[in-house]
């Protein structure tokens, strides 16, 4: 997007003000310190040892955390301690007027960190203890101070030494039944011969053993019954989750000469201490009670509750929230089955997944009449049955100046008391473009709607026996959409889909649509058709009306949870096929008409035959408290087959824009090394292809908190690369086809910086992109473009620096 002149002047003033503040912040912040004080300006951790570089990086990050490095230097913004300078303006310079009262909010201030050598020594002690807990019993930590002009920096030198690995694993379990459970699950053990010793691994193993024992019915089993003993010591070193190893290092001195020092571990599971030498008792489920309309602070003994005894469950309620048959099937507990912690979690999650209840609480109480029996009580607090919402959107991209949209959404979460959800939505939007002459013009308009039904089970048009414990949801949807690109084309589409959605695990999700049907109708503006489409056979075939019907399968993996706060992954793969069953219907119609007609001739619409595969992998690293590194790799390919020569326009790949390669405008990059320099490119610059490769790296960091922390100003720097290609040669677009030996030459590369305003519930993003490598640039054999940069030339900046404004992160 090119900003209008007045906007650029305003932005220039803002950036100039920011530069002045940063320059002031770079000035000395030490003049208010006492003579014997110094400002703590930096800390560094050097890790040396015979370990992998990735392990060194993880150790360096852990040792730099606030919990171990007790004194942290003041944060810097663009090499300036602006927050310390602002602090001094408020408390030492006593600045106070309306401007400073806004700027000098507490969120934007940092008290100068005065260096304290005692805290450095405490950090050394904590780091050493942490390294011992990671199995580095011979580790040493030293530090060096560097003082200059009342500023101190500290370097911590860490030598890891050799890491202990586990050797022999033995078990001391007097209860033979529990010992059998442990051995049956031993292949899943986290402590095995050759594994590096870490106290966290033993803690995780304790949790794993506790879980499998509780899943076998041992309701009262306590994790504190599990102890670990190392080597020949008869001392339980790991009675607690965190264990300092001070005082025990001398035990392992005999291992110093070994290439890989080892230790034996004995796992001991004690019998319950409160009942002498008796063994742990297995419990089973006795009775199950459900309260489907239980209010907050309700009374389960309320005499006005109606009671309905179903096959497995006694339902107590004032009114029917869910049909009793469906209610009983949704509860996964069964009388007579052993107590299971996993079944507890599955039951709660299944009931939450229905979407009917706001709170789900499952409690167990011992049955007074039967030994080792538990009664289960499910307290369910309902949500509101119907929801109505309105969403407003404002957007911007390099393709249009201003976009706005509104959507109206309605949802009934419990249709006919069956757990079926009815959803309806209407949406409309426009895109406006500000021309060089100044006036705003309408570039596109869109409106559409969708109706969907979601069943909390595996729904089929015929009856089959199903496992009640399945978490499959069935979804049927019907939608329509109309998109008009002014003076170019109108696209009308109607789509129908039927399929299933389920979670294989907490990290893995499947979306399967065995039936999808999409009709796409295209009406071309006559002038656009004559001047652009008719001159491009590929574009002409792309804009033909089409029937897209087939199957769609998606697999999603995401481990973004509390266990993976430092780094986590996201992976999605999607496979779509169109034409297989439509061609079958086409053949049947043709045979029934004596080969006179078929589905295509009757509807005057071509069947689209293609297979499309996409894969999207992302990984995120948290770098300290205020930084993060986000990476993404995307690959996609679509292959037309049978009578189809090209993919439908709405299924083709594009590159460039705020969520792609940001140094190019939306949909203008590629394919390959092709550059459209014809007059039609000014009318319709969109470029599409059959395949796409893309990679992105983005470093994100915090800048300032504003208005009491309600708005956070964040920054980013990024590197994007990729392109689109054709599968086959296109004589009208030379260089557009994919050739492996030309891959490096064809890859486009761009870099840039960005700022983001984070309002918590949404984020506004402004990115500046500039090309590093241009596939169609002929001045360098590999397309490197840096030598052509002319940042002083306003016309060059206008044509090469791309401004992208968008809502949300690019990935």
Language-model features: where?
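C-terminal outer-membrane beta-barrel translocator/porin domains of Gram-negative envelope proteins
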Residues: 301, 395-400, 511-712, 717-742, ...
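N-terminal secretory signal peptides that target proteins for export/translocation
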Residues: 1-10
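Interaction-mediating elements
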Residues: 3, 28-353
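Residues on the lipid-exposed face of transmembrane beta-strands in outer-membrane beta-barrel proteins
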Residues: 406-412, 449-455, 496-500, 551-559, ...
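Strand-connecting loop/turn motifs
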Residues: 136, 218, 385, 417-419, ...
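C-terminal motif of bacterial Sec signal peptides marking the signal peptidase cleavage site
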Residues: 23-26
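Gram-negative/organellar outer-membrane beta-barrel architecture
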Residues: 178-181, 320-321, 340-572, 587, ...
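Membrane-embedded beta-strand positions of outer-membrane beta-barrel proteins
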Residues: 390-392, 422-426, 476-478, 571-575, ...
